């Protein structure tokens, strides 16, 4: 992942990101921590960038260190609309974190529940009738 690509994702610069995608940048490129632009944008709360990356083929199921996915990062950052967007885009809602305290063995729905986000937890729980 180039510094420009990382900055566009972190800063919500959808125009720069779109330009780089058109130039052939891999939407699933990873930074030195194994995070993709989708993870960075989801964590930072940049919904327009998340949507552009999904439309460009970014994989919502990629995980970084400790098994954290873009959906999990959106949840722990309190970005409910982005977590919902990722779920609607087909993110694996059964993926579980591994190793990190507070994340090990937990799904995005578990993380939402831990943070008191009951409505979001229901949306992210495949066994819920609200999903």
Regions found by a protein language model. Give the residues of each.
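Leucine-rich solenoid repeat scaffolds
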Residues: 93-129
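Ankyrin repeat start-site detector
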Residues: 32-33, 65-66, 99-100, 104
């Amino acid at each position: 992942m180039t510094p420009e690509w990382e900055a566009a994702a972190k800063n919500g610069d959808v125009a720069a990101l779109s330009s780089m995608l058109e130039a052939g940048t891999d939407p699933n490129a990873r930074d030195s921590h194994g995070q993709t632009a989708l993870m960075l944008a989801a964590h930072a709360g940049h919904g327009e960038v998340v949507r552009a990356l999904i439309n460009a083929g970014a994989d919502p199921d990629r995980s970084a260190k400790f098994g954290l996915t873009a959906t999990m990062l959106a949840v722990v950052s309190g970005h409910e609309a982005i977590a919902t967007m990722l779920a609607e885009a087909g993110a694996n809602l059964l993926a579980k974190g591994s190793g990190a305290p507070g994340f090990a063995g937990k799904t995005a729905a578990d993380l939402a529940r831990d943070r008191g986000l009951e409505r979001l937890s229901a949306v992210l729980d495949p066994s819920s009738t609200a999903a």
